[in-house]
Amino acid sequence: MTHVLRARRLLTEEGWLDDHQLRIADGVIAAIEPIPVGVTERDAELLCPAYIDTHVHGGAGVDVMDDAPDVLDKLAMHKAREGVGSWLPTTVTAPLNTIHAALERIAQRCQRGGPGAQVLGSYLEGPYFTPQNKGAHPPELFRELEIAELDQLIAVSQHTLRVVALAPEKEGALQAIRHLKQQNVRVMLGHSAATWQQTRAAFDAGADGLVHCYNGMTGLHHREPGMVGAGLTDKRAWRSDERRVGKECLRLCRSRWSPYH
């Protein structure tokens, strides 16, 4: 079965295309092509791929950490209404048993599926941070990095744990990063007072980037570039919602690496 979706503007990896259509055959995009001359009907003003939201704590009045059976379904529907096709429910620093329970719920939802945006797995943000840039994370619940504990978290998640955020200056951080990467878990750096050197060492060990660049980390100084400086020299290391970081600062990030800034 073939059908066509026509849009005034259509987003592709090459940028926006005006007055183009998708030709879809058996659920697969078969062609991206100009709308024939004389066809005035448009199915959408703007047409683009669904987003993948890799860091979601909550929304629609609920939180990923809430111990209720319908929380993840509510969030999945909320994300779908925002144009998100898949997402990573993200935990926060909490007692270890509370984190385990959240990871178990996410794993079950990931495996059984359900309405709304697809759950791709879990994102562990905390408790492996340091107090100087703790943000909303309670420092009394921070923990040291131990390989056995990380393996337990992976097991509890039924191997659906996709990302772990940690502070790279913590004892054992580099070993933990290498181990997590061997387990196919991505590592982000944040809520940290790490130096430029410590951050670069973490990247060299396999860390994938910074979690909320500029926020929750050592700032940029002309004599000590800090985590922000390390991030600005590595294209993997930033993301922003333009609320916690000014647009001009975000433009600085983009100008380092993106042809579309």
Stretch-by-stretch model annotation:
Residues 8, 22, 27, 44, ...:
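Divalent metal-coordination and catalytic microenvironments
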Residues 1-48:
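Histidine-rich, glycine-flanked metal-binding segment
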